[in-house]
Structure formats: C-alpha cells, structure tokens
Amino acid sequence: MKKKPISDSPGRFAYDGLDRVIHEKARLSIITSLATHPNGLLFNDLKDLCALTDGNLSRHLQILAEAGLIQIWKGFKDNRPQTLCHLTEEGRKRFVEYINVLENIVTDAVSVEKAPAEEPKLSKGWSPA
C-alpha cells in the first residue's frame, strides 16, 4: 500500500525503499521484463528486450539470482542449450515495493511541476553564492 507523503518529516526524501539491487538500470530492465512475462524469458529474448550483451546480461542475472529475485533454469531444446529466467515470488514482491517508492517520487515531482519557482525570502546579509 502506498504511503501518503508527510511534508518535511525527517527522512522524507531519503527514499529508503529504492532497492539498490533493482535500481541499477540494466537490472531494472531485466526485472521489469520478467515481471511482464510471468512464464519467464529465454536468455536471448531477455538480452534483446534489455539491449544487453551476453556477458553483461550474465553478470546481472547472477547478481539478481544471488539476491533471490530470479531463478535461472538450464535445459535443452532441439539439442541446443537454453537458459530460462523467471522472477521469483520474492522478486515480484520486492519489485512491487520498489514501484511504490517510485510512485512516491513521481508524486513529489508532480508537486514541483505545479508550484512556481520563487526566490527565497531572506533577511539582509544574504547574497547568491
């Protein structure tokens, strides 16, 4: 459930829920791709969707698997090796939590868009740095 922002509370803009494992661009694209394909994706399909090289995708998949966010399955089809990647239940849960934090960030950003930029009202003695 999304929390309603409380203005100026301590840590208000810390966004602690931004999961560092997911937040990296390549891993975010992998997790998002897998979340939208509940039956999983083959390595080459995932590579194409995320525009990653074989080595780059392999390394990010390893990090996500070690974090328990994805499962990697090895098998054969037509005597050719295949790798299937699938989002775990824990991965799905953490991705949803991550998305909720992003929604809070978007809410904050929209409020900035609506508010006009103003010069601060300062007493004498202040000057721009």
Per-region residue spans from a language model:
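Basic, amphipathic "hinge/linker" alpha-helix immediately C-terminal to the N-terminal HTH DNA-binding motif
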Residues: 77-102
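Short beta-strand "wing" residues that participate in macromolecule-binding interfaces
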Residues: 72
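Short, hydrophobic-biased segments on the C-terminal half of alpha helices
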Residues: 61-62
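N-terminal helix-turn-helix DNA-binding core of bacterial DNA-binding proteins
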Residues: 13-56, 77-78, 82-86
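Glycine-centered, phosphate/nucleic-acid-interacting loop/turn motifs that mediate DNA/RNA or nucleotide
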Residues: 68
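Short, charged, low-hydrophobicity "junction" segments
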Residues: 1-5, 40-43
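Amphipathic alpha-helical dimerization/coiled-coil segments
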Residues: 2-9, 13, 32, 93-129
